[in-house]
Structures are given as C-alpha cells and as structure tokens.
Amino acid sequence: MKQGEGHTIYMLGIGGIGMSALARYYHSQGYIVAGYDRTPSPLTKQLENEGMAIHYEDNPNVLPALIDIVIYTPAVPRDLKEFEALRRRDLPILKRAAALGKITENHFTIAVAGTHGKTTTTAMVAHILNQCGKSTTAFIGGIANNFDSNLLLSQEKESVLVVEADEFDRSFLQLHPDISIINSIDADHLDIYGDRQHLVQSFNDFANLTEKEVIVKEGLGIVTDRGICFGFGNNNDYKTTIIRSEKGITDFVIQSEDSTTEIRLPMAGQHNVLNATAAFIAARKIGIPVTDIAEALTSFKGVKRRFDIRVNNKKHCYIDDYAHHPEEIRSCLTAVRDSFPEKHITLVFQPHLFSRTRDFMNEFATVLALADELILLDIYPARELPIKGISSEALLNKVNVNHKRICKKEELINLIDNEKPELLITMGAGDIDRFVEPLENMIKTW
C-alpha cells in the first residue's frame, strides 16, 4: 500500500511550476490530488490527463467533501473564496515551501539556491545523477528537456533528492539540505527583503542549515566553514577556464587540487558554464567519478524557457527565455551575441511586477539596450497592483535603442509576422510563454 492511499491533498494554485511538481509527487505516492487554478494551461491539462481533478472557478461549493491537507502557493490571494472556506474547515494548511521541506526531511537532499540559474543547475544535477545510475528524485522549477517534466521520480525509497531552493518569501529556509549550492545573489525581491544586505543574510541562514558542503560561487559574501568555492578566479577550490565557445557549444576545464577535467557543454554563456561547474562539484561530492560527470553533461538538453532555441534555420532564429531580472537579461543577450554575432536581435520583453520594474528601472534600461530592436509588452502584474508612474512606456523612454516600441499582446503575432525578424527573442516570466508555440509554428512557415 502506498503511503498516501485514501488521503486527499487539495492544492490552491496547482498549475504553478513548483506546485505542479508537488502534485505529481503526491499523486505518485498514492494520494488523491485535486486543486484550483485561475486559468487552464498546458501544464494543468497534463495534470488532468494524469488523473488529477482541477477546476478554474473560485467556488467553495465544488471543494471535495473530504480533504486531509491543503497546500497553497503564496501567489494565491488570501481573500480567495475557496481559501477562506478551507480555513473555516480547520484543516492542516501548508505553504508549498513547508510541504517540500517535509519531503526533504526524509531524504539525502541537494538544494540549489541563487537569484538566477537555480532551475538550470537543478536540472543539471538531476540529469548527471540520473545518467550515472544514481536513484534520484528531483523537483525542478521548469520543464527539463531531458525528462520532459518538472519532476524526476525515482521508484526507490533511498533516492537522492534534488530540489530548487526558492529565496522568495524566504521559502528555502524550510528545507533540510545535506549539500547546498548557491550560485548567485543579486538584489531581487526587494519587496520582501528591503535591501541586498538582508537578502545576503537570508542566503547565509540557508547555508547554515546545510549539514555537509556548501558549494558557493566566488564573491557572494557567504560565510561558512563548510564552503567549497568555485568560479573563474585562481583562488577557488574549483577553478573554471573556458577554452572556446561557438555555435551554442562551450568547451571548458575544471581544475581542483586533485583533478583536471575537460568538459563539453551543449550550451552557450558563461553563466551556464558556472552552473555546470556547481553541478559537477555536487555530483563529485556524492561519489560520482569526474569522467562520468563530464560524459553526462555532454547530453544535457537544457530547460524549456532557459535560452530555449525554438527555431534555428538558414533564414531565421527564435529563442525564448524566462529572464526577468537585469542580470538574467544581460547574461542571455550576451550569450546570444556570442553565439550569433552577425545577426540583428529583435527582443520582445514583458516586464514582470511593477515593484521590480520600479526598483531596477535604470538597470533594465541599460541591459535592454543590448538588443538591436526592442518591443515592450505591458507589465505583467502577477500578485501586484499598479504603481503610479511605473509602466512599460516609462521604461521604454529610458532605453537607448533606435528601434523601439510598445505592443499590445493581441497585436504581437501580426507585428512579428509583418516584420519577420532575423533573430527573435521572447523574454519574461509572465504570460508571454503563451506566445511561444504560436510564434514558433509561424516562424517555421516563413
């Protein structure tokens, strides 16, 4: 009998990338899983096809009669009618982070943290372990192309658990990591933390939760006696040197006190080389030989919406990316320039959150100017209300690009079809992802 047999878990915001992975995990453990989300999506349809009941109307009358546990995402508004009805039923109610934390209590856990790069790094660690025959369960904050899922599920009880550790709302402090990775700390979520100093402190708190090694990129300000430092500098425990990078393939070397390993990564960008270095160290620390790790990385296929090359033919190229912070945008556009130095870059960017746009207005303006042509969609509000004076128009006025414009979402497909850009990038963390398949299919007909 499976552990969840006969018990029902109800999930508010079940269609989110993190929530849907949890839903799949609980379903695999025998739980009856049902939930609510605001709108249908390809992911919710997949969950329904896997046997989970989902509805899209905030209606307490359709709640299951028997519920054992409620799990919610912070993205769900507290005044949701269903949420209020569930609280009145005096049920155990857990945040997603707390639920994931309970799972990590019972497994050897590798937790991947960082304001950028954690999804790709988590997928890399999971792929290496899986490829090298290590029993692995992984919760990934995106759809890993090697698994075509955000959940890698081991059928064995004694599996290694790999999880993405989210700093938003200090969620990662609910986890119980044995090995942790911290690969970036840039100012973000200032609505939660106030300033970078408090953000760094939270990452230090996360490091101190770690039982064994803390694998940390150089220069982040993490103070721990269990740290293993990596980066391009000479004084690191693991020093990485890029040999060459062309046509989306990067060759590099990782040197440590006792080994030198050459690696070919089928990805562009210095940031991805550092992600791979962190994954390499984590795999090595649980006993996987360096030659096996290097071999596994050659077959890593990336994550959907992370430098995701959707079309690349003689006439046109289309790349989709989740970047929504200035440093992520810089990394992506730099990698595109390195991979396609002769091409004219048209960027469609959907700013994510009024607060983030306000806090980094000048930084966004600087990095968006790395494109040759800029198309801005309206700000995606997510959980926020508008902020006076903060708009895509205000941002556009600050960007020093000759060809720039605002575009309504309903006009985007026609605009792109008329312009037929040589190299198109769609970018953002909002609902811009709904355009990816239509754009891909259209560009393939040009």
Where do the protein language model's features map onto the residues?
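Beta-strand->loop->alpha-helix junctions that form or flank phosphate-binding loops
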Residues: Y36-D37, H55-D58, L94-A98, F139-G142, ...
